[in-house]
Design a protein with these regions (language model features):
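Short amphipathic alpha-helix that is part of the acyltransferase structural core
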Residues: 1-32
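Conserved acetyl-CoA binding element of GNAT-fold acetyltransferases
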Residues: 57-72, 153
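Beta-strand-enriched, solvent-exposed domains that form extended recognition/catalytic surfaces
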Residues: 55-56, 86-91
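Conserved beta-hairpin
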Residues: 38-52
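Catalytic cores of nucleotide-enabled group-transfer and carboxylate-activating enzymes in metabolic
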Residues: 10-12, 44, 71, 77, ...
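Conserved acetyl-CoA-binding loop-helix of GNAT-fold acetyltransferases
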Residues: 72-88, 110, 164-169
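Nucleotidyltransferase catalytic core that binds NTPs
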Residues: 91, 99-351
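Short coil/loop residues immediately preceding or within conserved phosphate-binding loops
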Residues: 39, 61, 148
Length: 351
């Protein structure tokens, strides 16, 4: 008799059974960080044997595995995916994503998922609402004239610096209008709402700039599961490929974006890989323009990482040369809270 149960992966008797099933299906990476990120894991048992499993982290389904040695694998897949989506519904999560191997995409489509994009290594699908069409519908339109050049920029802005402002200004000089998409993941020192607020405040005087929340479609490193990929660098490259394809095929056409601007990345290997993949994926539909990073008076690159490091060190006096007044004032008002976040373990390095 088939039964769905919640699997406690902290239980030393349960974890190896779960891992063995997934390993037989080609999933090998079970880092503590990946497993700890899961909100819950379900298992389908038949005759006391684990024959299917699926997990969820936030609104992303992960670690899906189904024993397909017999002819009931389709039924098992439907059962476990129905169970995990119903559990998410109970948690008031009605918009659900899955990253999976491309060969499993059709199975997810049979149970109501829609494929957003795929690469040779991974497919990205969604189900529920608000979906990608709802996201696109809420993006403001530019009343652009025929032949106008509309540009796009995607930034984390953690926080918004003079470097970010410089990139936007350079895009404006070469374009008729600019969309600035703020990455929508609360995995940074500054929350998503704070980062978007600072970008809006720091560009308030710039006409023909629209600041937009990136939603769930500027795919985040924080939500992309690495368990079926061979290495960290491969994870970045494959995730970025999906991200670039979504921008090229979905976001850019809806917003009439013809060119995307990025800054050079002499200091960040991760973002350097990101820019390289963008250059391979975006053209010819979307041109890529790379702008040299802004430097300060001492000929040092202006980076958000440096700003965060100075916040951590309590060195706020020098920040005025790195960030616009609106960002500087925000940091001064919230310095204690930001410092508390750092003390609680919020990372300040990286992008």
């Amino acid at each position: 008799m088939a039964k769905i149960v919640t699997l406690d992966l902290q239980n030393p008797d349960v974890l190896p059974v779960w891992q063995r099933l997934l390993q037989t299906l080609g999933l090998q990476n079970f880092t503590p960080a990946e497993v700890a990120h899961l909100d819950f894991t379900l298992g389908l048992y038949e005759d006391q044997q684990l024959v299917a499993t699926a997990s969820a982290a936030g609104n992303v389904i992960q670690y899906v595995g189904v024993d397909n040695e017999d002819q009931v694998s389709g039924s098992r897949f439907n059962t476990i995916i129905s169970a995990v989506t119903n559990r998410l519904f109970q948690k008031q999560i009605f918009h659900i994503f899955v990253f999976t191997k491309p060969q499993y995409s059709r199975s997810f489509q049979h149970v109501g998922f829609h494929e957003l994009t795929r690469s040779p290594q991974a497919a990205f699908l969604e189900t529920g609402t608000p979906d990608v069409h709802d996201y696109l519908a809420q993006i403001p339109d530019f009343p652009a004239e025929v032949g106008a050049t509309i540009a796009g920029i995607v930034m984390n802005a953690n926080p918004f610096t003079w470097g970010h402002r410089y990139l936007i200004e350079q895009a404006l000089q070469a374009s008729d209008a600019v969309y600035v998409f703020v990455v929508n993941t609360d995995a940074s020192l500054f929350t998503t709402a704070e980062r978007q607020q600072l970008v809006e405040a720091g560009t308030a005087d710039l006409k023909k700039v629209i600041v937009v929340n990136g939603g769930d479609y500027m795919v985040s490193y924080a939500t992309f599961p690495a368990y079926f990929l061979p290495s960290t660098e491969a994870t970045i490259q494959y995730q970025t490929t999906l991200d670039a394809q979504i921008f090229r095929d979905i976001i850019a056409p809806a917003c009439h974006i013809k060119v995307r601007f990025v800054g050079t990345e002499p200091l960040s290997k991760t973002t350097g890989i990101y820019n390289q993949v963008l250059a391979e994926i975006l053209p010819p539909q979307v041109a890529l323009k790379v702008i040299d990073r802004k430097k300060d008076d001492q000929n040092h690159y202006v980076t958000a990482t440096q700003v965060r490091q100075q916040i951590a060190a309590g060195q706020l006096d020098d920040l005025a040369s790195l960030v616009p007044p609106s960002t500087y004032q925000f940091i001064q008002r919230h310095a204690q809270e930001l410092h508390q976040r750092i003390q609680k373990g919020q990372q300040i390095h990286g992008n």
